[in-house]
Each structure stands twice: as C-alpha cells, then as structure tokens.
C-alpha cells in the first residue's frame, strides 16, 4: 500500500518523549511493510529542545526519515511566525468557527501541498496523526482515511477545566472542551477508521461520536533502547521524566513538590528527587534552588541514566488522556513505579503486581517509604514491569497491530466503494 502519514510534528529523534516517540516508531514499523509518504508540520520549539539548532536538526531528521519514507516534506506553522502568534490565535478562536485545537494547524501552504500530493500520488490510506489535521480530510479524494487520537481532546480539555483554579482559564478551557466535543461529534464519523491508544479512549470517543469505526493501537516502547541496567541504583532516589511544557506533567510535578515532597522529606531522611524534562515551571526551579535534594534537570538528551539510577519511578499525573509513554519507558527499564491511577489509564498494569497506585499526598508518601524499605518487593515489581513491556508493548508487536488495522481499513473502503459503484450502474 501507499500510505500518507500526515503529522502535526516531525517524528524524530526516536529518543524523543511522548507522542513523538510513538509516531517515529509507528512510521518505521509501517515502512517495513508498506510505502510511507511523510508530510509533517515543524514545531520549531520541539526541534530546538531536542536537536539544538533547528535548521540543522531538520536536515538530520530529513536524512534519517528518508531511510524509511518514499517522500518527506516539512511544513511551517503560521502561528509560530511571531512571538504572540499562539496568543492571538487563541483569542481569535473564541469567536471563530473552529476551536483553537483545530485552528492551530490551518495553513494555506499545507492545503496547497496536500492538494499537490493528492493529485500526484494514488494513496491507498491517508493517515491523519491528530484531530487538529481533520480539516484537511476533504482534500484527499482517493484512499481510505484514518484518524489517530493520542488523547480524546474534548475529554482532556474538560478535565483540565474541572481542576483549573483560575476562573478565566477555567471558563476558557470549558468553552474549548465543549467546542471540541461538537467538532469531534461531526468530524470523527467521516473517517473510515479512528485509532485510539486504549479501550478506555475508545469508550470516550464513542460516547461523543457514537457512529465511529474505532480500533485500538496502544502506545508502545522500544524495549531494546529502554532496558534494565546502566549502573547501580541509588537506594533513596526517585525520578520523573516528561516534557514539562505539557500541562499534566507540570501539574503533576507541582502537586508532588508542594503536597508530597515536604511530608516525604520529614519521614525519609536522605531521599532525593530528579525531575527530568524541558521547560520546568518557575515554581519547581525555585524549589530546586532552596533544596539540593530536589533536582530539576531540565531537558537531557538521554533519560536512561537517570531512570536507571533511581530506586523508584514516581508518576503523579492526575490529568490528560491517552496513555502515558513515560510509564511504558519505566516499565521497560524494570523500574518499580508509584503512580496515580490516571497516569496508567490505557495500560494493562495491575495495582500491586507491576505498579503501585497512590492518589492522595499521604498515600504517595506511605507507598514510597514502604517500597524503599523493602528491596525484594521493589525488585519483584520491576521484574513484572519489564515482563509486561516485552510481551505487550514492544513496538514490533504494536507495529503489526497498526499494519493490520490500516490494511483492513483500506479493504473496507475498497469494498464500500465498489458496492457504491455497482449501485450507480
């Protein structure tokens, strides 16, 4: 098959966190079997954080992705051309047809390029890697259309509104969430296939848009790259890794720093915490300047040494949809994990078997203290975690699932098209 992978980001490098990691590995696995064409928007801030110089980083990305893809082209994002571009776009979205999440990637350059690609290549499947790209569906007149939901955007936005304390922000998030819900209800049934990361997100999507055809392609992890080892553990050390530009990550670390850490320090002398991730909030940085045991590392090119040395991985995320790839990374590295249940949504973990759940600050403290005082129990959790990652979430396994779903999507599309053609005769 000829598959167009239309992406809201450049899926490189493979060591990137979150959705970037998922997209890279799925493109690579799909390209083992089918011909992949990549059309990707450039999020310059992401490229800069991961690769330093943006232009040089894009050239590296192009050269690498050319190994897998029949054609690669990058697109600019209009709102990134000025310092206040996104702020102005958010303000305009309040009165416009589309919510901000959908307006973000609207571009004449993208429409022109998509039109040219549609005319020059007979795609069997056009895969849209996020809801924000759904307005471009109408351009592609041939082939099946699939839409990937890394999160159910309306659900995530409405959840964010419920926990936001600032009244104006809460109102904005609530309005955005309701408008996204209306958009999802209209747009998602137009696709031949909607791909979610978990059965829970499929339920959420079908609650919004009951007529959709949906299938789960879980997030995965590179179990060769993320594996146990890397040196001895520090017995009282904790770690969290995740891009702190994403509000659920930042909110999780602020919750931990302000509500859990003070109690934990009182009960466990010598405990340390490493927070890994670009763009840490100033409140976290301020705490790190006052407390040498709470270390905010910012962006690091390789998270594995920090995760490997930690005795426990802590993930107090209480918001956000999809599945959290940071949990999968920690599972693959054989780490004992203490996490809020929401952080593990969509992942087949069992509380007490391959992860320990905690919800409130006191629970986090109790679970952490107990595990750090029981090395055998901690190691057992880590072994179970690694086993789960290898058997269910390795990317070669996930890749086969994606290939099967896209092939079936195309077959249904062809069958429906042929039925329609016969009916017109």
Positions of predicted regions on the chain:
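A short, well-ordered alpha-helix in the C-terminal region of glycosyltransferases
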Residues: 377-392, 398-401
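Conserved acidic donor-binding segment of nucleotide-sugar-dependent glycosyltransferases
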Residues: 355-362, 370-375
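Short hydrophobic beta-strand element within catalytic cores of glycosyltransferases
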Residues: 326-329, 336-340
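N-terminal subdomain of nucleotide-sugar transferases
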Residues: 1-73, 121
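Acidic donor-binding loop of glycosyltransferase active sites
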Residues: 192, 293, 305-322, 333-336
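Donor nucleotide-sugar binding/catalytic pocket of nucleotide-sugar-dependent glycosyltransferases
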Residues: 146, 154, 173-228
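Conserved catalytic-core segment of nucleotide-activated headgroup transferases in glycan assembly
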Residues: 207, 215-309
């Amino acid at each position: 098959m000829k598959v167009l992978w239309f992406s809201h980001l450049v899926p490189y490098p493979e060591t990137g966190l979150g959705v970037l990691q998922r997209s890279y590995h799925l493109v690579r696995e799909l390209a083992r079997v089918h011909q992949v064409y990549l059309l990707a928007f450039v999020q310059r801030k992401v490229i800069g954080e991961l690769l330093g110089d943006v232009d040089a980083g894009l050239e590296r990305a192009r050269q690498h992705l050319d190994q897998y893809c029949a054609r690669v082209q990058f697109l600019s994002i209009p709102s990134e051309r000025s310092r206040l571009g996104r702020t102005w776009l958010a303000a305009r979205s309040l009165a416009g047809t589309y919510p901000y999440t959908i307006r973000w990637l609207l571009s004449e350059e993208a429409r022109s390029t998509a039109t040219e690609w549609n005319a020059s290549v007979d795609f069997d499947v056009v895969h849209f890697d996020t809801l924000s790209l759904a307005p471009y569906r109408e351009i592609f007149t041939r082939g099946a259309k699939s839409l990937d939901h890394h999160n159910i955007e309306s659900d995530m936005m409405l959840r964010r509104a419920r926990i936001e304390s600032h009244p104006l922000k809460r109102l904005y998030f609530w309005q955005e969430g309701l408008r996204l819900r209306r958009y999802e209800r209209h747009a998602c049934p137009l696709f031949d296939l909607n791909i979610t990361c978990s059965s829970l997100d499929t339920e959420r999507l079908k609650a919004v848009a009951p007529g959709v055809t949906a299938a789960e392609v879980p997030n995965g992890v590179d179990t060769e790259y993320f594996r146990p080892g890397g040196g001895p553990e520090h017995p009282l050390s904790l770690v969290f890794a995740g891009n702190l530009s994403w509000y659920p990550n930042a909110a999780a670390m602020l919750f931990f720093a302000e509500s859990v850490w003070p109690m934990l320090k009182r009960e466990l002398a010598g405990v340390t915490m490493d927070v890994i991730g670009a763009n840490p909030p100033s409140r976290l940085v301020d705490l790190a300047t006052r407390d040498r045991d709470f270390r905010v590392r910012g962006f690091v090119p390789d998270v594995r040494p920090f995760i490997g040395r930690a005795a426990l991985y802590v993930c107090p995320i209480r918001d956000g949809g999809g599945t959290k790839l940071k949990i999968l990374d920690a599972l693959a590295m054989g780490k004992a994990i203490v996490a809020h249940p929401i952080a593990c949504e969509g992942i087949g973990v069992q509380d007490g078997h391959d992860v320990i759940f905690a919800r409130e600050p006191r629970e986090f403290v109790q679970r952490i203290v107990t595990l750090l005082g029981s090395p055998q129990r901690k190691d057992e959790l880590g072994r179970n975690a690694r086993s789960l990652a290898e058997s269910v979430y390795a990317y070669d396994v996930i890749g086969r699932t994606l290939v099967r779903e896209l092939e079936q999507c195309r077959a249904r599309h062809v069958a429906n098209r042929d039925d329609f053609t016969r009916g017109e005769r």
